[in-house]
Amino acid sequence: MAIIADPKTGKTYKKEIPAERMGSLVGRKIGDEIDGVFFDLVGYKLVVTGGSSIDGFPMRSDLQTQGKKQILVSYKKGYRGKNGIRKRITVRGSIIGSDISQINLKIVQYGPTPLEEKKDDQQA
């Protein structure tokens, strides 16, 4: 599943990714630009901003791996404890693998038709 954020309107849209297209996204990283044709959005350019795995672990942009890692974090992305307290949490790397169930995307270039006019989109 892809969650596409529209920065102009502040709305998000859900798109299901077919299995044959998901294989072409494997190996992309957080921050990579993807053509909107993957999601039937002709003319759009999207940037990967994150995601989560089948197990529910979030992707983290500073880990250059596909697998899970246990890292020690303080008050930052993935842990919101009190200041000075650190905790070991499990996160996914920044590379999209076959076990990623949700990909978060942001629109950076708009196409000729607005997302609101797409009939098969669902608002998240």
UniProtKB/Swiss-Prot annotation:
InterPro entries: Ribosomal_eS6 (IPR001377), Ribosomal_eS6_arc (IPR020924). GO terms for biological process: translation. Keywords: Ribonucleoprotein, Ribosomal protein. One of its GO terms (cellular component) is ribonucleoprotein complex. GO terms for molecular function: structural constituent of ribosome. It comes from the Archaea. It holds the Pfam family Ribosomal_S6e. SMART domains: Ribosomal_S6e. NCBIfam families: PRK04290.1-3 (NF003294). Belongs to the eukaryotic ribosomal protein eS6 family. HAMAP family: Ribosomal_eS6. This is Small ribosomal subunit protein eS6. It comes from Thermoplasma acidophilum (strain ATCC 25905 / DSM 1728 / JCM 9062 / NBRC 15155 / AMRC-C165).
